[in-house]
From Swiss-Prot:
Protein's organism: Bacillus cytotoxicus (strain DSM 22905 / CIP 110041 / 391-98 / NVH 391-98)
Any Gene Ontology biological process: biotin biosynthetic process
Binding, substrate: R23, H135, T356
Subunit comment: Homodimer.
PANTHER family (UniProt xref): 8-AMINO-7-OXONONANOATE SYNTHASE, CLASS II AMINOTRANSFERASE/8-AMINO-7-OXONONANOATE SYNTHASE
Protein name, as recorded: Putative 8-amino-7-oxononanoate synthase
The entry's keywords: Biotin biosynthesis, Pyridoxal phosphate, Transferase
Molecular-function annotations in GO: 8-amino-7-oxononanoate synthase activity; pyridoxal phosphate binding
EC number(s) per entry: 2.3.1.47
Family classification: Belongs to the class-II pyridoxal-phosphate-dependent aminotransferase family. BioF subfamily.
Protein purpose: Catalyzes the decarboxylative condensation of pimeloyl-[acyl-carrier protein] and L-alanine to produce 8-amino-7-oxononanoate (AON), [acyl-carrier protein], and carbon dioxide.
Names of required cofactors: pyridoxal 5'-phosphate
PROSITE patterns for this protein: AA_TRANSFER_CLASS_2
Pfam families the record matches: Aminotran_1_2
Amino acid sequence: MEQAWNLHFYASLNRLKEKSQYREVVVTNQAEEPWLIRNGARMLNLASNNYLGLAGDSRLKEAAIEAIRTYGVGATASRLVVGNYSLYEEVEKSICDWKHTEKAMIVNSGYTANVGAISSLMGRHDVIFSDKLNHASIVDGVKLSGAKQKRYRHNDLHHLEQLLQTTPSEKRKLIVTDTVFSMEGDVAHLKELIALKEKYGALLMIDEAHASGIYGERGAGIAHVEPELSKKIDIHMGTFSKALGCYGAYLAGNEVCIDYMRNKMRSFIFTTALPPGVLATIQCAIAIVKEDEARRKRLLENGAYFRNVLKEAGYNIGNSSTHIVPVIVTSNEAAIRFSRKVQEAGIVAIAIRPPTVPHNSSRIRFTVTSEHTKSDLEWAIRQIVNIGKEEGFVE
């Protein structure tokens, strides 16, 4: 029996290798820095989600150490048992102040937040409208809910409305979207999505994982670029593991919606709570991003510079308008070759292939941070452009 299973595993892995979709993990150190250590070499880090450089911030480290001294290392239980430390209540109040919502709840990760929220809100008699390029956690949440799924073409509001029009009015409806799309670097049209959700009586849930801490008033997210919009969004989800440099995620909205999810969400109920040290770093990070406008501004400037120069050099960066800059090279083999070449040049940037992105859109996903210097980015661009010319990606 064991041999039969192993043969199945080997065959499956070999098929991935044949399609250039096999994945490996590589030991990396100092990934919280603009320059990291990988395979013993010092390399420029253009692959990290540490957008504001807070993962290595001394203030967050001290907050974690102090909380561990006070509360210990582990939460000891789920929040519904004895894991609901006072820190949870304090941080959730901070989130409400930051996001201007009635209530918030902290969840262990962005994945468990999306999977849990969507599957608790919707059921087999309901309909979910999901952008085709939404994150995998949204896709999995929709599947787990058992609801009928209607996927609309990426950022295509006309297609979304067509799908809404053909759905019986009595059906409960949820529209769900990323705000900053993690593999595209473009942004959802929230104002228009709000208009559609109001017209057709749907709930609207947004995933601010790659926007929280960066965009909008006090870094509260894309929903807060125009403050009046945020109050019209039913469920806000975001993570602390990217721009805030910590771990975990939040769900925020009105009081009854959050209370409902606390009572229905299996990924909240049946898991041990986050450690106190993590909660303390979240509290510290929120305080920093709310006030540190200069750090957010540096990130946006770095993103615009990197994006514009690569586009001018002839690279296909899609519709990116953020700090996430994909260079689309179509085939899996080309993406792997490109990634290998940039890493040989001293840059960490990873090939992204199906199923993470659609077929024939494999790419290198570059991400810049506020902590990259102009000289870092100038040097990287020279390497990337030279490689592109050598490999025929640009003329």
